[in-house]
Amino acid sequence: MRYVVFLLCILSFHAAAQSPAPPVVKEGNTFKISQHVYVIPDELVPMVPNVGIVVGTKATLVVDPGMGRRNGEAVLREAKKLSRNTEFYIVNTHFHPEHATGEAGFPPEAKVIRAAAQQQDIEEMGMQWVQNFASRSPGIAETLQGITGFRKPAEVFEKEKTLDLGGVRVRLLRLGPGHTRGDTVFFVEQDRVLFSGDLAM
């Protein structure tokens, strides 16, 4: 009997993973995991990343702001609840649309920082991936509506960069190729928290 229950649990989990739930970042669900780091969890919803928010005394860093403008706007609202910072940086673990196109929901003065290899991925394949994702379901197509390109980075780095947010430093490390050519991880030094994206699933 317990084997049947176990099998049913597996089938239920598989069905849930395949369900056409809209890829929406859940507002009001942000929680603190360390002194400077907050996470909006993916809630096991397909096409929703675990969004990271790192808050310093001078600036806020957002990691993987989700898919499309509306999700990006939701992430920005959550980030603004955590501090009075007006300076925002946006980084992505890789260029896939469910991680990177939420940049569109941030104001123009928010600064995007990318590894050169990730920028190359975007220039060569970015919109092709957006179109591919949009063709998968009406919900994803609606989420990506209005995405006609990726934001231009304020800064591009080759292998490594350290970002000082005020009282907390974040190391940006390009580790790809792995999941993609431009895979980048973000290590919050004081908190010893690592954002690895789809390199670790």
Residue ranges and their predicted role:
Residues 57-61, 69-114:
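Active-site metal-binding motif and surrounding structural segment of the metallo-beta-lactamase
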Residues 83-87, 107-110, 114-117, 122, ...:
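Sec/Tat-exported extracytoplasmic proteins
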Residues 34-35, 48-49, 85, 92, ...:
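Extracytoplasmic
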Residues 30-78, 184-198:
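Conserved beta-strand hairpin/beta-sheet module of binuclear metal-dependent hydrolase folds
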Residues 48, 70-71, 95-101, 119-122, ...:
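Active-site environment of divalent metal-dependent phosphoester hydrolases
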Residues 20-21, 25-27, 32, 120-175, ...:
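Metallo-beta-lactamase
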Residues 4-14:
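Bacterial N-terminal signal peptides
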Residues 38, 91, 111-113, 155, ...:
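Hydrophobic/aromatic beta-strand patches that form the interior of the parallel beta-sheet core
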